[in-house]
Curated annotation (Swiss-Prot):
Region annotated Disordered, chain positions: 26-71
Domain notes: The UIM domains bind molecules modified by monoubiquitin or ubiquitin chains and promote coupled monoubiquitination.
Annotated protein name in UniProt: Protein DA1
CDD domains with a match to the protein in the record: LIM_DA1
Designated gene of the protein: DA1
Organism name: Arabidopsis thaliana
Length: 532
């Protein structure tokens, strides 16, 4: 059947298609539509005579020569008849068939005559194969007349052997119906009616030369891009490809916020608390020191010194619950960024600080400017704070704890728990420690407080150890975002890559897990190192 395949494939129209992962080939195949109105051929005219049909018995050996000559004449007549019939079908099929040259037509006719001429001969009305009578007027395949039941030469009837082509039994993968004559698609290892090959996204037929796939589902390229091509969470545009043709984007390691690399250099603001970038359709609140705060973080932000006092009392109770009560009264002040930086410069004990300082435990006498009262914020901008000077006097080893204003409650609390540990160790007479040990154990305490807060929030208890209330500090169960924010602050502590805060925390956490907090602190006080 290779020769037939060559003829049929000669009329294929190939459309090469593909997506960003694979190229898919679609074939539009055109086959002649069967004609039921073919005019009779010369052999048909002979068969329509009024003379009665005579059935001849098989010839003897003496008649072989004459019979061979007659058979050759018959074969030639059949070939011419099939050639004329093929030309009639080609003209009727119109747009569904591709023109072929005369040599190809003659080759097709000769091939068919060879098949017909070599078919077995039977007497009129005899049965063939499964008891089906093949004779004048019999239908063959798809209800089309095959050979027209014509009688050739001396009344002998030629019953053609059924020739089954796989293409006659094509099943559409879309509707599971048979694909008859005409145009069809071959793609995704299946055959389709053109109207059945549809986009999985919009359910409309795919008629373009290229398409995309996800799994075994086809998509228009535009539909695939809309569904699967990543969009920037900042500008809401499709993330562009780089010079190598690959989609390149940035993503926050915790929030998985995807954004174009260009936003890292185009002054797109970040929230100073959660570090998420500001989307184009969202307005962050700008504090008077230039920091930006997203609306979710603003919802629980601690804005002035008075508002922070209940939280301070709660953390004091947290330490007392660990048998680590801070005996002296240490002032807590919320300050702006400039005041915090100035106080850090005035501190002489040489503590290590991060580039963005958000808390400070002071041991020197100085005057700082504290946020006494918060101001209402206008549209997208903080109106300002009412500040007043505060004179720090040295009554003990610790003069004050300073915290940056405008941070969410959980972040403010974790910073306060960190600075409280500095104060506790100084008041307990700990020796001067290496930076990684001191900052590491302070980070352990901040992490422990966050753990306790999130656990208390899961039992619908907010600040379980504090009965005080304050404007802006809400009671009741935490919102889903606030719990997520608390997990983010824990993640920041755990994933810190700095050798002082990050490595120090991991070493201190391991020691506390192995020996307990009390024994770890005793070992630090005696040796200045974490127990191993």
């Amino acid at each position: 059947m290779g020769w037939f395949n060559k003829i049929f494939k000669g009329s294929n129209q190939r459309l090469r298609v593909g997506n960003n992962k694979h190229n898919h080939n679609v074939y539009y195949d055109n086959y002649p539509t069967a004609s039921h109105d073919d005019e009779p051929s010369a052999a048909d005219t002979d068969a329509d005579n009024d003379e009665p049909h005579h059935t001849q018995e098989p010839s003897t050996s003496e008649d072989n020569t004459s019979n061979d000559q007659e058979n050759e004449d018959i074969d030639r007549a059949i070939a011419l008849s099939l050639l004329e019939e093929n030309q009639e079908q080609t003209s009727i099929s119109g747009k569904y068939s591709m023109p072929v040259d005369e040599d190809e037509q003659l080759a097709r006719a000769l091939q068919e005559s060879m098949v017909v001429g070599n078919s077995p001969r039977h007497k009129s009305g005899s049965t063939y194969d499964n008891g089906n009578a093949y004779g004048a007027g019999d239908l063959y395949g798809n209800g089309h007349m095959y050979g027209g039941g014509n009688v050739y030469a001396n009344g002998d009837i030629y019953y053609p052997r059924p020739i089954t082509f796989q293409m006659d039994f094509r099943i559409c993968a879309g509707c599971n119906m048979e694909i008859g004559h005409g145009r069809f698609l071959n793609c995704l290892n299946s055959l389709w009616h053109p109207e059945c090959f549809r986009c999985y996204g919009c359910s409309q037929p795919i008629s373009e030369y290229e398409f995309s796939t996800s799994g075994n589902y086809p998509f228009h390229k535009a539909c695939y891009r809309e569904r699967y091509h990543p969009k920037c969470d900042v500008c809401s545009h499709f993330i562009p490809t780089n010079h190598a043709g690959l989609i390149e984007y940035r993503a926050h390691p915790f929030w998985v916020q995807k954004y174009c690399p260009s936003h890292e250099h185009d002054a797109t603001p970040r929230c100073c608390s959660c570090e998420r970038m500001e989307p184009r359709n969202t307005r962050y609140v700008e504090l008077n020191d230039g920091r930006k705060l997203c609306l979710e973080c603003l919802d629980s932000a601690v804005m002035d010194t008075m508002q922070c006092q209940p939280l301070y009392l709660q953390i004091q109770n947290f330490y007392e619950g660990l048998n680590m009560k801070v005996e002296q009264e240490v002032p807590l002040l919320l300050v702006e960024r400039q005041a915090l930086n100035e106080a850090r410069e005035g501190e002489k004990n040489g503590h290590y600080h991060m580039p963005e300082t958000r808390g400070l435990c002071l041991s020197e006498e100085q005057t700082v400017s504290t946020v006494r009262k918060r101001s209402k914020h206008g549209t997208g901008k903080w109106a300002g704070n009412i500040t007043e000077p505060y004179k720090l006097t040295r009554q003990c080893e610790v003069t004050a704890i300073l915290i940056l204003f405008g941070l969410p409650r959980l972040l403010t609390g974790s910073i306060l728990a960190h600075e409280m540990m500095h104060a506790w160790m100084r008041l307990k007479g700990f020796r001067t420690l290496s930076q990684d040990v001191e900052e590491g154990i302070c980070q352990v305490m901040a992490h422990k407080w966050l753990d306790a807060e999130l656990a208390a929030g899961s039992t619908n208890s907010n600040a379980a150890s504090s009965s005080s209330s304050s404007q802006g500090l809400k009671k009741g169960p935490r919102s889903q975002y606030e719990r997520k924010l608390g997990e983010f602050f824990k993640h920041q502590i755990e994933s810190d890559a700095s050798p002082v805060y990050g490595d120090g925390f991991r070493a201190g956490r391991l020691a506390v897990h192995k020996y307990g907090l009390r024994k770890t602190l005793e070992h630090i006080q005696m040796t200045g190192r974490f127990p191993v």
